[in-house]
Amino acid sequence: MKITRLTTYRLPPRWMFLKVETDEGVTGWGEPVIEGRARTVEAAVHELSDYLIGQDPSRINDLWQTMYRAGFYRGGPILMSAIAGIDQALWDIKGKVLGVPVYELLGGLVRDKMRTYSWVGGDRPADVIAGMKALQAGGFDHFKLNGCEEMGIIDTSRAVDAAVARVAEIRSAFGNTVEFGLDFHGRVSAPMAKVLIKELEPYRPLFIEEPVLAEQAETYARLAAHTHLPIAAGERMFSRFDFKRVLEAGGVSILQPDLSHAGGITECVKIAAMAEAYDVALAPHCPLGPIALAACLHVDFVSWNATLQEQSMGIHYNKGAELLDYVRNKADFALEGGYIRPPRLPGLGVDIDEALVIERSKEAPDWRNPVWRHADGSVAEW
């Protein structure tokens, strides 16, 4: 069997799908994308196709290493996201050829179902509470919320009080009937993160995500030393080499690699195993589409330390398409009390509606995250 073609489809709301075709008619699907940089990743995928056309798709490890090592310059969000989507598609092909789900090729299940959580947007507490109640009625009891708005390097007590009051109101509305993590989104400097985390401790969030940017990862250990709250990070780390430094430094309790950014299944299985050796939990980042979610699930179901799986059903970013709109076998991704079962079909287990993908790709938006500014006019972290 030989790889014959790679085709990319940019799609609403902000996704990109990849189809890898073979000379024997077996196709694999992947989801290589950086939110807001889909065209750039698309170009990288097609550059990497030079290493793939005419090659045996079953040699996933060799193809991964070739894509990673054959170029003198490597790593980073664009190249690793391109590799990630290609890697997902290769695993999809291999599972389909052998007639088994990918998790069977990775050693089999370590659990029967995986707990998921839902991201809830909204700037006002009333909006967040309403969103959480709607999801709670559908069986969710684990959520992730924005921890704060933009903050200056040294900000005011008023800014801290506003962030804390918002969380206090949400906790008061639900008591201990729900769990929620707080995502700082890298918006907070190290000095302010230390203050804000301490003030939030009484409300017992499940974790604090990206309290500072990944570029400031050396700060995680210092922050962790001043709080009992678990620190989560990893969505903006792109290889096991990035995660190696974080694990060695300590401070992070939950790793959050993104299966569409951090090299795909091949790389993230290694990252999960590294985390287990340090007694660190795994909770893959996934505000993306169905192929990315399926890839996450295959890693979750073979990783003993996987504890939570993000999923994007109903997320506010999904303007123009919902999580399962491009999927025929929607029932296979049904949530039961906030849990999801292992994928059933061979490969990644996602039956893509290719005709719909082709049609909707004609109207793909160029999504960009907003640009925020501080009161003094300087650019703020989003």
Swiss-Prot record:
Record: residues binding Mg(2+): 183, 209, 235
Q: Does the keyword Metal-binding apply?
A: yes
InterPro entries reported for this sequence? DgoD-like, Enolase-like_C_sf, Enolase-like_N, Enolase_C-like, Galactonate_deHydtase, Mandel_Rmase/mucon_lact_enz_CS, Mandelate_racemase_C, Mandelate_racemase_N_dom
Q: What is its EC number?
A: 4.2.1.6
Active site per UniProt? 185, 285
Which HAMAP family would you find in this protein's record?
Answer: Galacton_dehydrat
Name of the protein in its database record: D-galactonate dehydratase
Source organism of this protein record: Ralstonia pickettii (strain 12J)
Q: What gene name does this entry carry?
A: dgoD
